[in-house]
Amino acid sequence: VAEFLDLVRISSPSRREGRVARRLVSALQALGARVEVDDAGARIGGDTGNVLGKLPGSAAGAPPLLLCAHMDTVVPCETVRPVVEGDVIRTDGTSVLGGDDKAGIAAILEAVRAVREAGIPHGPIDVLFTVCEEQGLLGAKHFDTARLSARRGLVLDCDGVNELITRAPAANSVRVTVHGLEAHAGLCPEQGISAIAVAAEAIAAMRLGRIDGETTANLGVIEGGLATNIVPNRVTVRGETRSRDLASLEAQSRHMRRCFEEAAARHAVTVDGREHRARAEVRIERSYDRLEVAEDASIVRLLRDASARIGRPLATRATGVGCDANVFTGRAGLEVANLACGMRAIHTVHEWVDVKDLVGTAELLVAALAVNAAQTA
C-alpha cells in the first residue's frame, strides 16, 4: 500500500513518465533484476522508454512469465493527493488517482518481492512497464518483443478483481478534416461554407455510442474556426470506433466515413461565377487488433490453477477497452491475457481502489508464479 501511494504521487502523464520510470528502475534493481530501458520514448516524443526488468528463476526448468503494466496515466494528474479512508484509497476530487495503471505496477512489485523474500520457487520473470499506453498503446507498439524470454504472460490493466480478460475489441481511429469556404460572417455569409456546420450535419446523422453488443463509436475532439466574424473554412474531428466483431468494426467505420462525405457533398456556393464545394478528408486507420485468448490457453489454465490454489473463483470475460495485451497477443507467438487489478472509476476524478483488492491481486500473482514454477518450459 505504501508503494502504491508513493507511485500515485508521482505525476506521469503520457510522454512524461520519466520520474516514475526512474523510481521503477531502482525498485527492480533492488529486487535483483537486470534492467533495460529501450528507445521507445525517443521514437514517440517522450522522456523515457519502456522499462524491462529480467529476474532469473529459482526453479530449474520452469518457463518464464511476463508481468506487464503501464506507467502513464490520463490527466489531470499533475498533483495527486490520495486520500485514505479505511480500506479505500481515493482522490481528493481534483485529479485522477492513477490506479490505472499504478495498481497493476504495485501488485507486480509486491508479488515479485514476496516470492523473492519468502524463497518461493519461481521461473524467470520478465517485468515490463510500458509508456504511452493511454495514447494508443504506443509503448507496446514500439517494444521489441524479441527482448522477452517469456512466451506467455499477464498485463494487469483492468477494473474489477479476480477476473481475467480474454476478449477485447479491435479499434480504428477516425480523423476528419472538413474544408469549407471562409467569408465575412456579417457582410456576406452566403458566400461562405461553414465547415463547422458541415461537420455538425455529419455528426447529427451518425450512429454513435453503443452501436450493438460488440461495437462502440465516439467522436471525442472537434477543433475549428478562427473568429466569430469569419465563416469557418476548416474543422478537424477526431474519434474512434471499437468492436470485438471485425465485420461490425468495418461497417461502423464505413458509416462514419459516409456521413462526413455525404454531408460535404450537400454544400456548395458560387462566388464570382466560380463554384466552391465543401470537402471531407477522412482517414481511418487500425489503432490495434482485437484480443482473443482461448479459454483453454495455457495462460488461462495457469490463472485458474493459481486461483484454485488460494481458494478464489476466477471469471473470464470480455471488455470494451484495449490494453497492451492487444498488441502482444499473437505477436511473435506471445500469449497474453489482461488480469483485473482492482482499479475503479478510472479516467475520472472519482477514481478509487480498495486495499483488499490490491493485496488480493498480489496474492494471485504470487500463486501464479508458484504454479508456473511447477511446470516445465
Could you say what each language-model-derived stretch is?
Residues 72-87, 165-177, 304-305, 337:
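Acidic-glycine-rich active-site phosphate/pyrophosphate-binding loop
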Residues 1-15, 286, 344-347:
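N-terminal capping segment at the start of a domain
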Residues 41-43, 71-73, 128-136, 158-160, ...:
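Acidic, glycine-rich active-site loops and adjacent beta-strand->loop/helix elements
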Residues 83-96, 177-183, 310-311, 343-347:
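Glycine/charged-rich beta-loop-alpha catalytic/anionic-binding loops adjacent to active sites
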Residues 13-60:
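A non-catalytic alpha/beta surface segment that caps or lines the substrate-entry region
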Residues 21, 47-50, 54, 60-124, ...:
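Active-site metal-coordination/substrate-binding segment of hydrolases
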Residues 93-169, 211, 217, 228-229, ...:
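Acidic/histidine-rich catalytic neighborhood of metal-dependent amide-processing enzymes
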Residues 195-377:
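Metal-dependent amide/peptide-bond hydrolase catalytic core
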